[in-house]
Swiss-Prot record:
NCBIfam families for the chain: PRK12419.1
InterPro entries in alphabetical order: LS, LS/RS, LS/RS_sf
Pathway: Cofactor biosynthesis; riboflavin biosynthesis; riboflavin from 2-hydroxy-3-oxobutyl phosphate and 5-amino-6-(D-ribitylamino)uracil: step 1/2
Keyword terms of this UniProt record: Riboflavin biosynthesis, Transferase
The gene coding this protein: ribH2
The protein's name: 6,7-dimethyl-8-ribityllumazine synthase 2
Function, in words: Catalyzes the formation of 6,7-dimethyl-8-ribityllumazine by condensation of 5-amino-6-(D-ribitylamino)uracil with 3,4-dihydroxy-2-butanone 4-phosphate. This is the penultimate step in the biosynthesis of riboflavin.
GO molecular function: 6,7-dimethyl-8-ribityllumazine synthase activity
Family stated for the protein in its record: Belongs to the DMRL synthase family.
Organism: Bradyrhizobium diazoefficiens (strain JCM 10833 / BCRC 13528 / IAM 13628 / NBRC 14792 / USDA 110)
Length: 165
């Protein structure tokens, strides 16, 4: 028997979300998108546009351009940055996360990250299976964070407009 469905709060105004997904390790990263879309719909985020970029490094520029259009009330980024043995992958990951934070602070459009950087990732079926499951969990978590933040911002902006905050 399934547990009763949870009724999530509804938004006062329609929300439109951009989901920017890196194609590097697509079979892993797309699990976040699939889980996000399902959870987002349950949370009344029904307008989601999906954009693909080659890798995680390309996500911040796309996020910034999308934020500047003012079409989107939120942007979600998903990618996998792994140690390929040549470059210091944590520098790439750090740069991407800082750039995403800069985008949201400059544009006041919230940006959520499901860009993950495991300490170890080996191209074995065991690691692929683990990270597919992990990205599915992160997809749900980022949908929860997105919906809750948008509800909070909607409330806060209403209070600011009313002179309460």
């Amino acid at each position: 028997m399934d547990p009763p469905a949870i009724e999530h709060p509804r938004f006062a105004k329609p929300q439109r979300v951009a989901f920017v997904q890196a194609c590097w390790h697509r079979d892993v990263v797309e699990e976040a998108r699939i889980a996000f879309m399902k959870e987002a719909e349950a949370r009344h985020l029904t307008h989601v546009d999906v954009f693909e970029v080659p890798g995680s490094f390309e996500i911040p520029l796309h996020a910034q351009i999308l934020a500047k259009t003012r079409r989107y009330t939120a942007i979600v980024a998903a990618g996998l940055v792994v140690d390929g043995g040549i470059y210091r992958h944590e520098f790439v990951a750090d740069t991407v996360i800082k750039a995403l934070m800069d985008v949201q602070l400059r544009t006041e459009v919230p940006v959520f990250s499901a860009v993950l950087t495991p300490q170890q990732f080996h191209e074995t079926e065991v690691h692929y299976d683990f990270f597919r499951r992990h990205f599915a969990i992160k997809g749900v978590e980022v949908a929860e964070a997105c919906a809750n933040t948008l509800l909070g911002l909607e409330r806060l902006r209403g209070q600011v407009a009313a002179g309460i905050a």
